[in-house]
Amino acid sequence: MLISSVKVGEHFYFTLGVFKLHAQVFIVSFFVILILILFSVLGTNKMSQTPRGLQNFLEYVLEFIQDITKSQIGEPHYRDWVPFIGTLFLFIFVSNWSGALIPWKMIILPEGELSAPTNDINTTAALALLTSLAYFYAGISKKGLRYFSRYIKPTPILLPINILEDFTKPLSLSFRLFGNILADELVVSVLTLLVPLIVPLPVMMLGLFASSIQALIFATLAAAYIGEAIEEH
């Protein structure tokens, strides 16, 4: 066995003008976006005062997202952030489930293989950076330049620690989501090779549960950071 001949981290790229794009992430991300758009169109196509079927399900999802946002941000600001928190939650949720349910690895690519977008550190880092920009925007739009006074509270001695905290938030968000989804897919792949008929199903169910929890944690923390930024001390 020639261990040195094994190539790690192969990716499939395509070029768009001067840009080199990560095709594996883009393909599955567009699939996830199409799924979300399709559900939205079908659920709101023939809306009625008495919701049923898909409309009823979508209204339940919206209420769930509103509850998350309201509990972390509070009145009266939470309504402005429901679309952002909802977009984060739904994209991560559907991405995670697509990685657990759809056999992406059966699709042959020139290089690399398809997987959930959240299985790529670039995706989770981008989502975490968007969250950071969101809570900076929330704080500055609410307080103006007074927002930056929080770095010297309760004492200026804590200035380095408070600055470091803004760097650790996106790091923890991105690596937590990436690590959990990557580990789940690796476990399912290995067990499928070892015991293809018995073990993978319960492990897959556990993976779906863990994937849902990770989407909830990410959305809740994003809302909590925004609520912290606009909170008056």
From Swiss-Prot:
Q: Which GO terms describe its molecular function?
A: proton-transporting ATP synthase activity, rotational mechanism
Superkingdom: Eukaryota
A GO cellular component annotated for this chain's UniProt record is:
proton-transporting ATP synthase complex
Chief subcellular location? plastid
Q: What is this protein called?
A: ATP synthase subunit a, chloroplastic
Function noted in UniProt: Key component of the proton channel; it plays a direct role in the translocation of protons across the membrane.
Concerning its family, UniProt says:
Belongs to the ATPase A chain family.
Q: Which HAMAP family does this entry report, sorted A to Z?
A: ATP_synth_a_bact (MF_01393)
Q: How does it assemble?
A: F-type ATPases have 2 components, CF(1) - the catalytic core - and CF(0) - the membrane proton channel. CF(1) has five subunits: alpha(3), beta(3), gamma(1), delta(1), epsilon(1). CF(0) has four main subunits: a, b, b' and c.
Tell me the InterPro entries matching this sequence: ATP_syn_F0_a_bact/chloroplast, ATP_synth_F0_asu, ATP_synth_F0_asu_AS, F0_ATP_A_sf
Regions crossing the membrane:
82-102, 121-141, 177-199, 211-231
The annotated topology with respect to the bilayer is: Multi-pass membrane protein
* Primary gene name: atpI
Q: Which UniProt keywords apply?
A: ATP synthesis, CF(0), Chloroplast, Hydrogen ion transport, Ion transport, Membrane, Plastid, Thylakoid, Transmembrane, Transmembrane helix, Transport
The family database entries (Gene3D superfamilies) matched by this protein are listed as: ATP synthase, F0 complex, subunit A
What NCBIfam families does the record point to?
ATP_synt_6_or_A
Database matches in Pfam families = ATP-synt_A
Location in the cell: Plastid, Chloroplast thylakoid membrane
